[in-house]
């Protein structure tokens, strides 16, 4: 497949995550968060698919916000604490369109 992004060993090699080109991400009032963009297929109306890896450092915060489309949260390292509880490594949370958190 041409132009495919291959990210290997993200689960088995925890250092692989540290080697990605993370960029600071402050959208929706985030603090202590970084983003690694995978793709952005949104159109001019901000509709369409987008995928990224997010890294939340200890003490990270996010203000409540709406997701117009699905959001998949897969915890690669550490523990995610949100309004649905505490989620350890290996947890996949599927948030439906229209969800807020």
What does each model-identified segment do?
Residues 73:
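Structured binding elements
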Residues 30-67, 81, 85-86, 96-100:
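Conserved short histidine dyad/triad with adjacent acidic residue
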Residues 70:
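Alpha/beta-hydrolase fold active-site loops
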Residues 1-47:
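A short, N-terminal "cap"/entry segment at the start of jelly-roll beta-barrel domains
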């Amino acid at each position: 497949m041409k132009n495919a992004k291959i990210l290997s060993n993200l689960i088995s090699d925890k250092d692989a995550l540290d080697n990605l080109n993370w960029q600071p991400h402050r959208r929706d009032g985030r603090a202590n968060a970084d983003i690694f963009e995978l793709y952005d297929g949104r159109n001019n109306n901000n509709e369409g698919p987008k995928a990224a890896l997010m890294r939340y450092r200890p003490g990270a915060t996010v203000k409540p916000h709406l997701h117009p489309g699905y959001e998949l949260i897969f915890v690669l390292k550490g523990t995610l604490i949100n309004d649905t509880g505490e989620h350890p490594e290996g947890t996949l949370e599927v948030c439906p369109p229209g969800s807020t958190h």
